Amino acid sequence: MNKDRVKLAIAPIGWTNDDMPDLGKENTFQQCISEMALAGFIGSEVGSKYPRDPNVLKPMLELRGMQICNAWFSTFFADGQRARTIDEFTNHMNFLHAMGAKVIGCSEQSKSIQGTTKAIFEEKPYFTDTEWQRVAEGYNELAKIAATKGMQVCLHHHMGTGIQTTEEIDRYMSMVNDDVYLLFDTGHAYYSEGSQEAMLAILEKYLPRINHVHLKDVRDEVVAEVKAKKLSFLDGVKKGTFTVPGDGVIDFRPVFKLLDEKGYQGWMVVEAEQDPAIANPFEYAVKARRYIKETAGI
């Protein structure tokens, strides 16, 4: 891959899990970003322990040669919370803009079960036609707002949400304007669709409109247990559904090849939520960085 076009970041969720704060509560913010830099990454997404004042956060990152590339934002358009979502989005956007980020990764969280005890496959939510329309109109509006700051909005397809499957991604992308992008997540695509081929098909279909990439690997044996026992998303995370690239079932070489051939320009972010007491985050960050260097050449 071309290192002039693609930058490597890592998400703090491997150190401290915002959905389950007890996982990694002992890991400090400064330890987290220091280990990211030491592992060879130059970018990070934003976790709950990160200072939200750019005047505080930016110098701490710059000291380590790091920068912010994105931060999760939850939208609630399907639920009819348009005004609240847009108001909170504007504040979030201004923070990211001050940090120098160019993309805003969003997830439509109306009806989401990802943070609940519900079975991740059997109790997945679905949107009505009216809710789909609200989501599309809402994201089109967010894209216009982001453009005023020279930024772009992308939708993070995610397990346990109304935009998870290939069909749902297709419907979403067909309804929004061309200035609304997709955040492609290898792990969530594989987890949802169950195969390397289906995961790659999403990537290939939408590459011109993918502006942010999450690199997440999957352990097939844990997914099988999640299905057999009808476990929740968070139960799966604690058991090790996800891991870093090179440690699970996904072959990332075709992913990197597609991104390179299509001229992808932006960040690739290692995002692998595990229990840090079991999977040492620094050790796994080093493992991920080594694998990417070996397979992507950057």
Swiss-Prot record:
The keyword Endoplasmic reticulum does not apply. It catalyses: scyllo-inosose = 3D-3,5/4-trihydroxycyclohexane-1,2-dione + H2O. Keywords: Cobalt, Lyase, Manganese. Signal peptide: none annotated. InterPro entries: IolE, IolE/MocC, IolE/XylAMocC-like, Xyl_isomerase-like_sf, Xyl_isomerase-like_TIM-brl. It is an enzyme of class 4 (lyase). This is Inosose dehydratase. Disulfide bonds: none annotated. Belongs to the IolE/MocC family. Its cofactor is glutathione; Co(2+); Mn(2+). Its EC number is 4.2.1.44. It comes from Yersinia enterocolitica serotype O:8 / biotype 1B (strain NCTC 13174 / 8081). It comes from the Bacteria. GO terms for molecular function: manganese ion binding; myo-inosose-2 dehydratase activity. It holds the Pfam family AP_endonuc_2. One of its GO terms (biological process) is inositol catabolic process. SUPFAM superfamilies: Xylose isomerase-like (SSF51658). The gene is iolE.
